[in-house]
């Protein structure tokens, strides 16, 4: 036996049966004996969570209806109908477009147990299709931005969260509001590098104590400025993410250059003071010796 989730067991049986057509929420499978089929069927029948998906009176083993789900040894063929789970994101999704319609995914929660039919991909598979990886990256970005936002606004009638960023300067403040989403068009955009945003999260600050607070402030200010100047929504921000990153890098470079110049001036002043003190002490010592 394995530690498969019920959904993973259903996916394994679906693949073993040759991935037949799915009729709505019902999946009819014809299975010939194989060690792999035997293991998966026993996982299905012995797990209370998995066996609930077996349609009653539609489990036939070697031509005989199986009433108690006690799969006999040495079976030859099985006909079984399953009712696929539909009550959460942990289900069979016909396409990646179906997956991203779930509000939890749009809010940055990448699911841990799901299957995309047209990609033949389950979330525990080793090889991740590019489209799925992009959804995962956008989810990571949404989560990171959510932690960097000054606050979340859920007062809208649709109940969807909006991330509010505030820029303060010269006693005045500006704000930018982003409503996270994932659209099918976004899957055609260039790969999104979300590392810089994740590094600025509070729980990552221990890894970079140098100017961490300043970097976070520069990022927020750049985001507000960039969104307002271009009147971008979240999708447009993702589309132009590389340009935004460049704007942030430029602003950060300006800050660091100013900081280094200020630090250099302080170092020079300190060195001059130290030299002056040492020179003064040397002169005083020499004068004392002469007078003595």
What are these regions (language model features)?
Residues 1-3, 145, 283:
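Polar low-complexity intrinsically disordered regions
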Residues 1-127:
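Long, contiguous, compositionally biased segments that the model treats as domain-scale units
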Residues 12, 43, 52, 56-58, ...:
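Glutamate identity and glutamate-enriched acidic tracts
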Residues 243-268:
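Short, charged cytosolic
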Residues 68-250:
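Extended, non-transmembrane interaction/recognition domains
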Residues 262-292:
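Transmembrane alpha-helical segments and their cytosolic interface motifs
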